[in-house]
Amino acid sequence: MRLILLGAPGAGKGTQAQFICEKFAIPQISTGDMLRAAVKARTELGVAAKKIMDAGGLVSDDIIIGLVKDRLTQPDCSKGYLFDGFPRTIPQAQVMKDAGVPIDYVLEIDVPFDAIIDRMGGRRVHLASGRTYHIKFNPPKVEGKDDITGDPLIQRDDDKEETVRKRLQVYDDQTRPLVEYYSSWAAQANPADKVKAPTYRKVSGTSSVEDITASIFAALK
């Protein structure tokens, strides 16, 4: 099972990625983790990436794909792998395709933006303990107070509506077009392609965690 997981920030990808990886006994591939490991191990690609990052630049797609190809040779990828957060853009998807990285499924968890803003904007946190509440779905016993200590709860900057809207706009501009990219590739599959076009599946991410998981497993049969 080799798949790419798509979905806007706050769509619940992280939760579902864990369930998918457990069911199919595959690793979750994170480009951030790969970069940190390569830099720490001082591999050729890691050294090249560190130079760029130290200069404040963005690591090129070619370096990322090099890291991906190295990662996929590891034994834990023998049954497949899950990409979450990569590719983010059509150029990255094209580089993956050109490099011959095989993908069986592209799975999108679809949640309307208004629901995501509601979901993320309602989060409140007790910083000292990490306890998390939601003003609508999991409210504290006393409004604005931690249940255990009575300390005030805060809203993280990342959860403020303005920040959430900006992140969703970036997703809409850069990543959502991947849905069309993969759908078109499947529809116009070319025998000359290095790798077979993946199957695109979309599931709704607005029901319970258990129902979403069941929908995902049904879609990946």
UniProtKB/Swiss-Prot annotation:
Q: Which InterPro entries match?
A: Adenyl_kin_sub (IPR006259), Adenylat/UMP-CMP_kin (IPR000850), Adenylat_kinase_CS (IPR033690), Adenylate_kinase_lid-dom (IPR007862), P-loop_NTPase (IPR027417)
Cellular component terms (Gene Ontology): cytoplasm
GO biological process per UniProt = AMP salvage
Q: Which residues are ATP-binding?
A: G10, A11, G12, K13, G14, T15, R123, T132, Y133, S207
Catalysed reactions listed for this entry? AMP + ATP = 2 ADP
Keyword tRNA processing among UniProt keywords: no
Q: What is its EC number?
A: 2.7.4.3
| Written domain comment of the UniProt record | Consists of three domains, a large central CORE domain and two small peripheral domains, NMPbind and LID, which undergo movements during catalysis. The LID domain closes over the site of phosphoryl transfer upon ATP binding. Assembling and dissambling the active center during each catalytic cycle provides an effective means to prevent ATP hydrolysis.
Self-association and partners: Monomer.
Say what the protein does. Catalyzes the reversible transfer of the terminal phosphate group between ATP and AMP. Plays an important role in cellular energy homeostasis and in adenine nucleotide metabolism.
Q: Which family does it belong to?
A: Belongs to the adenylate kinase family.
What name is this protein filed under?
Adenylate kinase
Q: Which organism is it from?
A: Polynucleobacter necessarius subsp. necessarius (strain STIR1)
